[in-house]
Curated annotation (Swiss-Prot):
It comes from Homo sapiens. Changing residue 253 to S: In allele MICA*056. GO terms for molecular function: natural killer cell lectin-like receptor binding; receptor ligand activity. This is MHC class I polypeptide-related sequence A. Residues 1-23 form the signal peptide. Induction: By heat shock, by infection with human cytomegalovirus (HCMV), human adenovirus 5, M.tuberculosis and diarrheagenic E.coli, and by exposure to DNA damaging conditions such as high doses of ionizing radiation, chromatin-modifying treatments and inhibitors of DNA replication. The HCMV UL142 protein causes down-regulation of the full-length protein but not of the truncated MICA*008 allele. Disulfide bonds join 59-64, 119-187, 225-282. Changing residue 128 to K: In allele MICA*036. PROSITE patterns: IG_LIKE.
Length: 383
């Protein structure tokens, strides 16, 4: 049975970590997802690859074709890169479908198996590699690809899934050992190749800063400072009164989110007394540069950015979609003609793994709607 169009909410696309004194390591991250429907593993799979935290490759159909995500990647690397990645991603998708087929406790309905692989090269040339498995969005198994050490959460369900998958992977011990050694080496080899090509040069793109104010309410106004179009993602944005930073509890920060073109955006807001606008400024610091931005006086027309417009449209579309689904289900119940959903909503959560220190790169998550034709041809033969 084919799934038809599947709506996915895919999280963890962009990893974030608090800025520290040490330089961030270079990283290559593979995120693969396969699906099953009523115990039948579907033929499609979804893969997203991030290079130094930026979207790099994406493969979302049965006949996968890796495509560069953003002009910054397309300008540097040629067709040979995409051909090689397409071949490797297709093989990895097949392996993950075979793993999903050996999970014994699958029940009716839609289920997902997600594999995340991350390799890093640090400033001192040390390396780290890890692999993590999620079933229906829940982490159940992690492995340090360098030490071959496995870890798993304490829940009984996670341990059952972990033993199931480990037993399958250990059916041929020598093959498994060779496979994971190659996985570790290949990831680092690809990362070094990209570093050598110059595609991940530590470029800097300064932010555009815009300060807006709301209409007065009970003698107060809300002032918002937005920074957009900057890279890298770590930025300082805060409000100051007479040159002194406001306390943390008087400000509200938005998450640092991708703009969709390889850069990032964020905002900070606070409430101030009407008439004291000239005492407040927004302070921005990014990649060694800093600037201050005053609150505009008088009434200001606030124009929506492309991201805001998309966000509002997406929320409205989601609300309409939910209403339609609710109406259809009610009608089906009344007519007793429900034969299973044509549109399925799947939420794959790229969470922090529990019980391992190897996967440290996802502390803030944003959600991005994604439409895909996964599994349009039904189950795979021989996985």
């Amino acid at each position: 049975m084919g799934l038809g169009p599947v709506f996915l909410l895919l999280a963890g696309i962009f990893p974030f970590a608090p800025p520290g004194a040490a330089a961030e390591p270079h990283s290559l991250r593979y995120n693969l997802t396969v699906l099953s429907w009523d115990g039948s593993v579907q033929s499609g799979f979804l893969t997203e690859v991030h290079l130094d935290g930026q979207p790099f490759l994406r493969c979302d159909r049965q006949k996968c074709r890796a495509k560069p995500q953003g002009q910054w990647a397309e300008d540097v690397l040629g067709n040979k890169t995409w051909d090689r990645e397409t071949r490797d991603l297709t093989g990895n998708g097949k392996d993950l479908r075979m793993t999903l087929a050996h999970i014994k406790d699958q029940k009716e309905g839609l289920h997902s198996l997600q594999e995340i692989r991350v390799c890093e090269i640090h400033e001192d040339n040390s390396t780290r590699s890890s692999q993590h498995f999620y079933y229906d969005g829940e982490l159940f198994l992690s492995q340090n690809l360098e030490t071959k050490e496995w870890t798993m959460p304490q829940s009984s369900r996670a341990q059952t899934l972990a033993m199931n998958v480990r037993n399958f992977l250990k059916e041929d011990a020598m093959k498994t050992k060779t496979h994971y050694h190659a996985m570790h080496a290949d990831c680092l080899q690809e990362l070094r190749r990209y570093l050598k090509s110059g595609v991940v040069l530590r470029r800097t793109v300064p932010p555009m800063v815009n300060v807006t104010r709301s209409e007065a309410s009970e003698g107060n106004i809300t002032v918002t400072c937005r920074a957009s179009g900057f890279y890298p993602w770590n930025i300082t944005l805060s409000w100051r009164q007479d040159g002194v930073s406001l306390s943390h509890d008087t400000q509200q920060w938005g998450d640092v989110l991708p703009d969709g073109n390889g850069t990032y955006q964020t905002w900070v807001a606070t409430r101030i007394c009407q008439g004291e606008e000239q005492r407040f400024t927004c302070y921005m610091e990014h990649s060694g540069n800093h600037s201050t931005h005053p609150v505009p006086s008088g009434k200001v027309l606030v124009l929506q950015s492309h991201w805001q417009t998309f966000h509002v449209s997406a929320v409205a579309a989601a609300a309409i979609f939910v209403i339609i689904i609710f109406y259809v289900r009610c009608c089906k119940k009344k007519t007793s003609a429900a034969e299973g959903p044509e549109l399925v909503s799947l939420q794959v959560l790229d969470q922090h793994p529990v019980g391992t220190s190897d996967h440290r790169d996802a502390t803030q998550l944003g959600f991005q709607p994604l439409m895909s034709d996964l599994g349009s041809t039904g189950s795979t033969e021989g996985a």
